[in-house]
Amino acid sequence: MKPLIQVQGVSQRFSTASGEFLALQNVSFDIYEGETISLIGHSGCGKSTLLNLIAGIALPTEGGLLCDNREIAGPGPERAVVFQNHSLLPWLTCFDNVALAVDQVFRRSMSKGERKEWIEHNLERVQMGHALHKRPGEISGGMKQRVGIARALAMKPKVLLLDEPFGALDALTRAHLQDAVMQIQQSLNTTIVMITHDVDEAVLLSDRVLMMTNGPAATVGEILDVNLPRPRNRVQLADDSRYHHLRQQILHFLYEKQPKAA
């Protein structure tokens, strides 16, 4: 199977007041169509830097990245990003926030009526059809993230990039959105790359977990295959010995092999 995303010998340096800082060193891995990949590691290990490189928001100092066998040289609609901060424009309705992305990508290929139907379809997909005409200040944090996901999906991306999208949410809202992401991935076969600090979230959602070494000069230390059948049910997994074994492997890497500095 041909990889959809290829990260090839990537290093990333930054100039700082105290000199050059090597954030990532010689990072290489492939991501295949329909996979859900989690990036996990301690703060400062370069997870967001790596996601920004895949998004094309930044370019690597060394090495290269490919999406569908084309060089990633900047942002593109085939790689949609959802940040922890929903990034919705507060003066626009939920519908209009999604419309900004849809109009930019599909203005020439869809009629105005088709774009309207597509926007509504994607908001319905994340259970936000009831809030089309509400502004961000009128809805909850979890609902804002749903609109952000709808906006990303409406671009018809090949890859959905999630930068700790549930980190600021309460536990129940977080669980509902995790379930929504699993349902979307299953129905659309979307390729997902997600940053998380949550070990349980990584095991629940992922096909593979990329565990990052501590920075500076961080790299992928180990890759864990999550061979749990889908669809996954969090209640059933709580009693599954395989789930607990996978969880323990991640914890062992993070706190035994890569202990966080005090």
From Swiss-Prot:
Keyword Membrane: yes
Organism whose genome encodes this protein: Klebsiella oxytoca
Family: Belongs to the ABC transporter superfamily.
Protein name per the record: Nitrate transport protein NasD
GO molecular function, one term: ATP binding
GO cellular component annotations of the record: plasma membrane
Start and end residues of each ABC transporter domain: 5-239
SUPFAM superfamilies from the UniProt entry: P-loop containing nucleoside triphosphate hydrolases
Gene that specifies this protein: nasD
Biological process terms in GO annotation: nitrate assimilation
Keyword Membrane: yes
Chain segments annotated as transmembrane: none
Membrane topology qualifier: Peripheral membrane protein
